[in-house]
Regions:
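S-adenosyl-L-methionine-dependent nucleic acid methyltransferase catalytic domains
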Residues: 1-232
């Protein structure tokens, strides 16, 4: 069977129950999920995007009769792929480097070692290009909405550019956060965001903090104001 007609797993079947369960569960995740950093109104579940990308690139066993000549062999291999996807869509496994590397190897095996780049021309909240990148694929995104463009720059363009690099904030490159000066993935960038964010807050307080006085409580104590309501 030629490469152009090879049937992909998504054309045959998917473990929809597991994908749906994890997609629904994402709504309650409040740590590390992009939705906690910014709002997008039609955000696609990361679990579904990850599963669909994997299944549309990996061959269905029926497309490889040389490796799986019988129906029983094809069913067994399809079951293995289903179980793999069921692990792949779990949120707690989203940063499992060994699992993601195994997913990438499965994709390479089905694409002759040369998987196609992934383009989402209306990327919105960035779920598809983000998950393509997580699976080790070349990802591209665009959108008509400038907010979506900014979101995708922050998700898939800037972090890879600075992956593995130490922070540039003075005095942090060899601090305790980096183990022996090693900053894996985008941890160096994240440290810079924390450090420069703190610096900007302190500088703003130094310059205009006097415009935001402490509130006097009924018992005479003073406390910081959590939110100001402006009225005319």
């Amino acid at each position: 069977m030629s490469e152009t007609t090879r049937r992909k797993l998504i054309e045959v079947a998917l473990p929809l129950e597991a994908i749906n369960r994890e997609s629904a569960r994402e709504k309650s995740i409040r740590h590390g999920h992009p939705s906690t950093l910014h709002l997008w109104w039609a955000r696609r579940p990361l679990a579904a995007a990850r599963a669909v990308l994997f299944a549309q690139l990996v061959d269905d066993p029926s497309a490889r009769p040389d490796e799986f000549p019988t129906q029983a062999a094809q069913d067994a291999e399809r079951k293995r792929l289903f179980e793999f996807i069921e692990r792949l869509v779990v949120w707690e496994n989203a940063s499992d480097e060994r699992l993601l590397a195994a997913a990438h190897e499965e994709i390479l095996r089905s694409t002759g070692g040369n998987p196609p780049p992934i383009l989402d021309p209306f990327a919105g909240g960035g779920s598809i290009p983000l998950e393509a990148q997580r699976l080790g694929l070349e990802a591209h995104a665009s959108d008509l909405n400038p907010v979506a463009v900014l979101i995708n720059k922050a998700l898939i363009e800037i972090p890879p550019r600075y992956a593995g690099r130490p922070p540039v904030f003075p005095g942090t490159a060899h601090s305790v956060e980096g183990v022996a000066g090693h900053w894996p993935r985008a941890t160096g960038l994240a440290e810079d965001v924390r450090r420069y964010g703190g610096w900007m807050r302190d500088e703003a307080e130094r310059r205009i903090g006097h415009l935001y006085p402490l509130a006097t409580l009924p018992d005479g104590r003073e406390a910081k104001v959590i939110a100001w309501i402006w009225a005319r």
